[in-house]
Structures are given as structure tokens and as C-alpha cells.
């Protein structure tokens, strides 16, 4: 019997430089949530936090959820993810992808994801702003899609640079600071599912 807290399918790669993907399949494949871990992070996340997230989202919304690891690699990881979704039948002409990325995964989503119009909304959590700062700000300024939300813990190293994003804040591009939270959102039993629901799936 399969563990209720496991992925329905796990896709590995025979090269360390390729992302791995954990998938839970929902009844609604028109909407798909893509979760991107931080640098070196696994698809399951520390203490299975992403695995818990995907099951809670699937159960609440009926959507399929894909979690991606984030290896140290030169490949275009968003293009790789789109290819994986297509292969699994999760990316069609009618698919709307909701993206949530953490740390380096948030930066990858911001820098590479806008090339894919199927990604309709972004939740970018604690991206390291000191890396590619001008490009991230330019993308935020020029973003014309449905929604791009930046979220920083008040004690994250990049929070002081979030003010540069505030300059471009508008209806479809928002910036939120979480008081007392660190880079990993690890304090006070933080509810990650609630954050995703309110900032991305609302």
C-alpha cells in the first residue's frame, strides 16, 4: 500500500545536474501548481515540507501538483520543468500553471519563467536579491501577467532590497513582508499552505 504522504510518481534523472520531480495527480489538470525548491533542495523539502504542501493543495483544490528539486546546474530549469510536465500530460493548450519558488527556486522562476505564457501566476518567496538584482527588478517592472507576488521574511538577508521592488508595486505585482520570519519561514509553525492559498490561488 502506498504511503499517503508520498508522491504518486517520482521522476529521477541519471545525471546529477538534472532536476527531479515529485508529482501528485489531481482531478483538475487545467490548473497545475509547480513548486520549485531552493538551491540544492529536494522535491520533498526539508522534513517533507513540500510533500505536505502538495497533498494539502491537491486535497483542497483538486489540482495536480509538481515539486521540482533545484540542482546546481547551467541548464534552463524552467524549460526542463515544462518538458517534464508535457511528458506527463500535465501541460496542454488549456493549462494554467501556478508557480511557487523558494530562494534560488524563486529567482529561477522569475528569471526564466516569464518565457512560458502558460505560467499565469507567481509566488516568489525570499529570492536572493543580491544575485541578478537589476534583472529581477526589470522583470517585476515590466511584468504584464495575471499576478506576481514577492514575499520576504522580515529577517531574510534580501529584505532590505525589497524596497526596490516596492517601487514597481501595482495590482498585478505585489510585495509582502512577513514579520519575524527568516529565510526558511521556519518560525512559529508557519503555515505554508495558507501562504500559497492567499497569495497565489486566491
Residue ranges and their predicted role:
Residues 15-19, 25-67:
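Short, surface-exposed "cap/lid" segments of acyl-processing enzymes
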Residues 131, 154-159, 183-184:
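Acidic catalytic loop of the alpha/beta-hydrolase fold
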Residues 48, 136-137, 159-168:
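Short alpha-helix in the alpha/beta-hydrolase fold that links the catalytic acid
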Residues 143-144, 149-152:
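Short beta-strand/loop motif that positions the catalytic acidic residue
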Residues 123-132, 153:
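Active-site nucleophile loop of the alpha/beta-hydrolase fold
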Amino acid at each position: 500500500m502506498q504511503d499517503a504522504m508520498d508522491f504518486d510518481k517520482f521522476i529521477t534523472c541519471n545525471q546529477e545536474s538534472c532536476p527531479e520531480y515529485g508529482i501528485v495527480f489531481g482531478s483538475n489538470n487545467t490548473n497545475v501548481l509547480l513548486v520549485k525548491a531552493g538551491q540544492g533542495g529536494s522535491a520533498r523539502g526539508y522534513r517533507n515540507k513540500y510533500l505536505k504542501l502538495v497533498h494539502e493543495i491537491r486535497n483542497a483544490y483538486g489540482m495536480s501538483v509538481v515539486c521540482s528539486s533545484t540542482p546546481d546546474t547551467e541548464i534552463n530549469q524552467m524549460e526542463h520543468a515544462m518538458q517534464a510536465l508535457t511528458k506527463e500530460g500535465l501541460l496542454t493548450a488549456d493549462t494554467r500553471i501556478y508557480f511557487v519558488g523558494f530562494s534560488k527556486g524563486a529567482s529561477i522562476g522569475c528569471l526564466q519563467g516569464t518565457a512560458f505564457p502558460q505560467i499565469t501566476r507567481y509566488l516568489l518567496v525570499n529570492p536572493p536579491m543580491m544575485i541578478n538584482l537589476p534583472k529581477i527588478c526589470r522583470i517585476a517592472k515590466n511584468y504584464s501577467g495575471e499576478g506576481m507576488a514577492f514575499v520576504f521574511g522580515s529577517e531574510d538577508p534580501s529584505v532590505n532590497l525589497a524596497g526596490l521592488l516596492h517601487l514597481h508595486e501595482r495590482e498585478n505585482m505585489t510585495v509582502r513582508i512577513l514579520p519575524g520570519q527568516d529565510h526558511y519561514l521556519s518560525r512559529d509553525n508557519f503555515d505554508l499552505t495558507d501562504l500559497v492559498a492567499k497569495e497565489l490561488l486566491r
